[in-house]
Amino acid sequence: MLDNVLRIATRQSPLALWQAHYVKDALMATHPGLTVELVPMVTRGDVILDTPLAKVGGKGLFVKELEIALLEKRADIAVHSMKDVPVAFPDGLGLVTICEREDPRDAFVSNKYHSLDDLPAGSIVGTSSLRRQCQLAERRPDLIIRSLRGNVGTRLGKLDNGDYDAIILAVAGLKRLGLESRIRTALPPDVSLPAVGQGAVGIECRLDDARTQALLAPLNHSQTALRVTAERAMNTRLEGGCQVPIGSYAEIINGEIWLRALVGAPDGSVMVRGERRGSPEQAEQMGISLAEELLENGARAILTEVYNGETPA
C-alpha cells in the first residue's frame, strides 16, 4: 500500500458500494489519519445479465477483476459479499478478515402476497439462485420459477413491472440499501437454508502485505469468522461453485456450533440434508465431515448431474 493510503477495489453496484463504504468507515474510525480510497470496477458478472449465472461461470464472475487489481497492486484490498466468494483464491491472495454478519436469511418480496404459502398455484417467482430454486420447488412444486438477474434495484423493478408475482432476495442486501420495507417475510432457515457466508462481508488482500493485514485485523468478527469457516469448509469439500444448489448455515448456540447443510436437485425432486454440532475449534472439520456425509447420501450424484447440465431422475 502507498504511504498512509489504502485503496479498496469494489464493484459499482449500490450494494457493493455500500459494503466498500462500510469497510472504509470502519477502517477510518479504527485508524484516524488513514486515507481510504475506493477503486470502482466493472466485473463480467455486472455485464452479462441476460444469462443465468449457472451457465456463465457462477458468481466468481463478480470477483475476478477485483483480484487482478490486487495482484497488479492497483488496489490493496477487495471487499466481497461472502456468498459471492469462490472456494479457491489466486496464488498470493487470501481472505484475511470477515466482518460481523448481518441477517443471513432469504427474503420473500411481493406486492400482492404476504408469504410464500399465500402464493396461488401457477404464480411466477423470480430468483437467479439454484439453491433458492431447489428449496422453492420442493416446498411449492406448483409454482413457476424463472431466472432473475441484475442488481437489487433492477430485480425490484421487474417485480414492480408485473413480470413476477414474487421474488426471493437476501434480507441483508435489502436492509443495507434501506429497503427493509420491501420484505414481506424473512424465510427461516428450515424453509430456505441460506447460502454459504450469506450476510457476511469479507476482505481479501495480498498475503505478503503484512501492513494491510494489521490494519484489517480489528475489523474481524471472530464468531462470524467461525461460522463462515464451517460453512466454507463444507462447500470446499463439496467442490461447490457458487452456481450450484448448496445451502449451508452455521449458528453458535450456547458456545456450540450448529451447522446445517443441503444439496438439492434444481427441480426440488431430490434433497440431501444433514447437520453437525460441535465445539468452535472443530468448525473446519465439522464442515468437511458433513460434506462427506452429504456426498455419500446422494449429493455426489446431484452435483455431477448439475455440472453436466442434467437434472437427476
From Swiss-Prot:
Cofactor(s) this protein requires: dipyrromethane
Reaction(s) this enzyme catalyzes, per UniProt: 4 porphobilinogen + H2O = hydroxymethylbilane + 4 NH4(+)
GO molecular function terms attached to this record: hydroxymethylbilane synthase activity
GO BP: any one term: protoporphyrinogen IX biosynthetic process
Record-linked CDD domains: PBP2_EcHMBS_like
InterPro entries given in the database record: HemC (IPR000860), Porphobilin_deaminase_cofac_BS (IPR022419), Porphobilin_deaminase_N (IPR022417), Porphobilinogen_deaminase_C (IPR022418), Porphobilinogen_deaminase_C_sf (IPR036803)
Cofactor note: Binds 1 dipyrromethane group covalently.
Enzyme class, spelled out: transferase
EC number: 2.5.1.61
Modified residues (S-(dipyrrolylmethanemethyl)cysteine): 242
GO cellular component, one term: cytoplasm
Pathway assignment: Porphyrin-containing compound metabolism; protoporphyrin-IX biosynthesis; coproporphyrinogen-III from 5-aminolevulinate: step 2/4
Pfam family, one: Porphobil_deam
Keyword field: Porphyrin biosynthesis, Transferase
PANTHER family hit by this protein: PORPHOBILINOGEN DEAMINASE (PTHR11557:SF0)
Family: Belongs to the HMBS family.
Function noted in UniProt: Tetrapolymerization of the monopyrrole PBG into the hydroxymethylbilane pre-uroporphyrinogen in several discrete steps.
Note: The porphobilinogen subunits are added to the dipyrromethane group.
Quaternary structure and partners: Monomer.
Protein name: Porphobilinogen deaminase
Lineage: Bacteria, Pseudomonadati, Pseudomonadota, Gammaproteobacteria, Enterobacterales
